[in-house]
Amino acid sequence: MINRIILLVIDGFGVGAMPDGAAYGDADANTLVHLAEAVEGLSVPNLEMLGLGHLATIKGVRSTTQPTGCFGRLGFTSPGKDSVVGYWEMGGVIQKEASTVCGAGVPPKVVDVIEQIFGRKTIGRGIALMGTMLRRYGMEHMATGSPILWTDGGNTCGIAMHESSMAPMEFQQRCREIRKAVKDAGLFVRVVAQPLTGRHETLKPQVGRRDFLIEPSGLTMWDVLSRSGQITMGVGKVYDLFSGRGLTKSFPTASGMAAFDEVIGLLNKVPRGLVCASLDLLAEEVGQAALVVQGFDRRLPELFERLRIGDMVIVTGDHGRDLSFPEKTATREYVPLLVTGPKLAHGVDLGTRSTAADVGQTIAEALGAERVLTGESFLDALRPG
């Protein structure tokens, strides 16, 4: 019987382009394979033992003959390739239509709305990850107080401001107003409000990021777990991605490792239910990304040694992020599905799942909740023979 599930979702953890990847310009995407090649091999022995090496030919990662976990790949049925798409589908909600793609940066009419609400000119406005924009425009922002603006090229608009330029609570409120103002235009599903701290040389995200977006259009695993009386904890951006619906409590963090710390702490406090954490490990510079991924792998034993009978751990991703691509933004890829836990089966090939909703369905069944709207549970495959 499963009593507690720890779901670790690594942002951009791709293992190869999906069949429709070419439609997104991602036909050759393979996040982990290309990352490993760039650094002459990854050292991730704990992920290796879970079965990661069975999913792709990743330099430095063996295809072990006796994995301690069950392994497979998750695909996505929903169009798109960002965290909203990934998390919602994992939660059991498949979107039918893709959001408008902003291939030329933040549209001028949206820039006008943002500048009107802030009462200031914006800087940036292009397609990039936040770290790139901070390096490019951090000095100008510190000198002028102008909000740094960017998009992922899809349905997300990001806004960053230093705490000295605007109080974090006021900044969040204005970003909330922006989300309301642009929702009717159908351009952005999500507005990210990222407060900053430090000086230009050390400018970095501050704890307190908020993601403002529409609620999921259907019943999610969070809803059914909440209805069944389960404890549901979101670490990182999870709470905001579901507009808080069905979650007991949120634990915002400023980094992937801080999120992992939070998970370790929650294992001593949460006796049952679901703990889900978003882990942003793939920095834009490949060397740093490799170090962080390897550092995460080294810390996995901290998690494993705290598990008890009735626990299940799932390690997966929400989309790819192939850092060999110039934009270094999200890519349309399969993501790993690695599952382990005391008294669970070892070495079972879970195959290539056509939809990430299989995760939500499995979690709902394992914790005794009603079915979510879509997805096929793989719980039976995890039972020891």
Where are the regions a protein language model picked out?
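Feature captures the catalytic ectodomains and active-site-proximal regions of enzymes
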Residues: 1-385
